[in-house]
């Protein structure tokens, strides 16, 4: 190879023809080998990804963040780096607060153990397996867990939040930020024992990132940021993170989608409408009109100045509403300044905004004091089927909004608190609206009439079976069963009668001590005095009882034909 290259350089130096040199340049086998090696490594890399996540959960090009230690919650709004700051600005909206306070009060009804309530309303810790029966040890541990949740800690501390206060806080947090955070504090001596849990401001908790800007999957995954500085870091076990509306969007960085963010336009429109309507009163624009009196040109300017002073002094503010200013002029003319209905349709517009916001939170506007009379704007059209029954509307509203909220809180407690004790227990809210319970009873009544027996229904409720409970409580079914029972009883009676007759027939008179019968009865075949004998028309001699005894007559004739033989007479024989 070296000799070949030296020959080529020599020919080039001497100026010889070099066209044949191009054809004789050897192929670099090493380059092709490197290409093949890269291809093989690429295939091996793809094979190594099998069994691991291949889809991207974060942007391929890492987000350029001014804070490299954590990932902020970004907003679709312009000039906003942290969505938490934007959402916090709308936290004082009256419609949002009406929804939050309503749901908080409803959740607070469940924030005590159900065993403390006569109606069984509250929360309970039970066995995860419904078929498992808790023993004495399990029952004691269940009560201990319930008391821990009720006091938000192992001991009762008046300076610490109760479970009701804790739930009120996280309801506001999840409805504002769609993020709930609470810290779990463990015992200093025993790191496996949790002492208490405390709600934390979610606007200060962020996902931590490594030096490459990627979200940390393990270890100190969460950080608390105050004034754009990291002040504390937590593991997934130490800091609970609850997202009610998760999403797969890469730019979301694992954060949820708040209803406030979705309805941002509606909240801004509501604030603008209230501000516009408020300024209509506060800036003196409430006069109904002007009484204009025409005057000479020299007096017009002076009258205008007087009018301005009078307007500012007498007609500004709420006390100047609906007053009529008067100016000097030659002619009198009234200028109407009262806005028409088309210019101030605030009611329908505000009703529309309230309905949109309420729909996002799954709550009926009537629950927050804005009854909807049909349609998106509260008009007469579009009445719902359940409008005549406010109770049904309220129950449906709670099923859409309250029940999912309770399930969300249940999942938080089970994931981050109950799991610290044992996986065989589960936390849940029980009880509810009385009307709903009555509806369940009505459903159960219909079930036991169609396909479920009484004992099956009692078993589902944890009750013992009762005698005669393996039936359906349906009139037609019970009547049919009664007819079948009567038929079976009739058949049994007939069968018994037949059996008695056969038994009576099979009872032979030889089974008892025979009674003395006269010879005449035996001969004539007359009925015996023995009550055990069957009354038969045939006598013992084989002849009918109602006919003359032939053998008796033959014996009588023979006796008459043998005179002198014996001392007995036929009459004596007969009398015997």
From Swiss-Prot:
Subcellular location(s) of the protein: Virion
Presence of keyword Transferase: no
GO cellular component: viral capsid
Region (Disordered) residue spans: 374-399, 506-576
Keywords, sorted A to Z: Capsid protein, DNA-binding, Viral capsid assembly, Viral contractile tail ejection system, Viral genome ejection through host cell envelope, Viral genome packaging, Viral penetration into host cytoplasm, Viral release from host cell, Virion, Virus entry into host cell
Pfam family, one: Phage_portal
One Gene Ontology molecular-function label: DNA binding
Compositional bias segments (type: Basic and acidic residues): 519-533, 565-576
One of the protein's GO biological processes: symbiont genome ejection through host cell envelope, contractile tail mechanism
Subunit structure: Homododecamer.
Role, per record: Forms the portal vertex of the capsid. This portal plays critical roles in head assembly, genome packaging, neck/tail attachment, and genome ejection. The portal protein multimerizes as a single ring-shaped homododecamer arranged around a central channel. Binds to the terminase subunits to form the packaging machine.
Record family assignment: Belongs to the phage portal family.
Protein name per UniProt: Probable portal protein
Organism: Staphylococcus phage Twort (strain DSM 17442 / HER 48) (Bacteriophage Twort)
């Amino acid at each position: 190879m070296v000799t070949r290259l030296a020959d080529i350089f020599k020919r080039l130096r001497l100026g010889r023809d070099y066209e044949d040199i191009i054809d004789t340049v050897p192929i670099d086998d090493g380059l092709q080998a490197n290409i093949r090696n890269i291809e093989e490594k690429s295939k091996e890399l793809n094979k190594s990804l099998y069994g691991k996540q291949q889809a991207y959960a974060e942007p391929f090009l890492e987000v350029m963040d001014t804070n490299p230690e954590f990932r902020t919650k970004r907003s679709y709004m312009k000039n906003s780096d942290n969505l938490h700051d934007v959402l916090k600005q709308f936290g004082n909206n009256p419609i949002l607060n009406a929804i939050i306070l309503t749901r908080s009060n409803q959740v607070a009804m469940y924030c005590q153990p159900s065993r403390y309530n006569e109606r069984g309303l509250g929360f309970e810790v039970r066995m995860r397996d419904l078929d498992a029966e808790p023993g004495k040890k399990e029952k004691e541990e269940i009560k201990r867990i319930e008391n821990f949740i009720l006091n938000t800690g192992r001991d009762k501390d008046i300076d610490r939040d109760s479970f009701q206060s804790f739930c009120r806080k996280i309801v506001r947090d999840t409805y504002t930020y769609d993020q709930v955070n609470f810290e779990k504090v463990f015992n200093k001596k025993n790191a496996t024992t949790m002492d208490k849990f405390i709600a934390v401001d979610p606007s200060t908790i962020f996902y931590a990132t490594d030096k490459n800007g990627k979200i940390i999957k393990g270890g100190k995954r969460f950080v608390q940021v105050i004034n754009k500085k990291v002040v504390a870091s937590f593991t997934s076990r130490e800091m609970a993170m609850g997202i009610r509306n998760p999403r797969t969007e890469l730019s979301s960085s694992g954060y949820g989608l708040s209803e406030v963010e979705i309805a941002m336009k509606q909240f801004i429109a509501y604030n603008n409408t209230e501000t516009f309507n408020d300024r209509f009163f506060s800036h003196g624009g409430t006069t109904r009109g002007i009484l204009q009196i025409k005057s000479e040109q020299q007096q017009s300017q002076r009258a205008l100045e007087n009018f301005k002073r009078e307007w500012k002094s007498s007609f500004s503010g709420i006390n100047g509403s609906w007053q009529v200013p008067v100016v000097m002029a030659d002619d009198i003319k009234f200028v109407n300044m009262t806005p028409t209905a088309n210019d101030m349709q605030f009611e329908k517009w505000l009703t529309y905004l309230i309905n949109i916001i309420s729909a996002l939170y799954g709550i009926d506007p009537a629950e927050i004091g804005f009854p909807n009379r049909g349609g998106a704007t509260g008009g007469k059209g579009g009445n719902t089927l359940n409008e005549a029954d406010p109770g049904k509307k309220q129950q449906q509203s709670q099923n859409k909004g309250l029940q999912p909220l309770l399930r969300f809180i249940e999942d938080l407690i089970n994931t981050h608190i109950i799991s610290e004790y044992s996986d065989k227990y589960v936390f849940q809210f029980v009880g509810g609206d009385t009307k709903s319970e009555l509806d369940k009873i009505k459903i159960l009544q219909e079930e036991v009439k169609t396909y479920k027996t009484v004992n099956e229904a009692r078993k589902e409720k944890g009750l013992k079976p009762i005698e005669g409970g393996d039936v359906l409580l349906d009139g037609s079914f019970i009547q049919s069963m009664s007819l079948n029972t009567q038929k079976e009883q009739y058949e049994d009676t007939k069968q018994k009668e037949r059996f008695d007759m056969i038994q009576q027939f099979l009872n032979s008179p030889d089974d008892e001590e025979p009674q003395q019968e006269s010879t005449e009865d035996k001969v004539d075949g007359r009925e015996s005095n023995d009550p055990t004998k069957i009354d038969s028309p045939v006598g013992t001699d084989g002849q009918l009882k109602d006919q003359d005894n032939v053998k008796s007559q033959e014996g009588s004739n023979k006796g008459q034909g043998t005179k002198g033989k014996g001392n007995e007479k036929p009459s004596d024989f007969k009398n015997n």
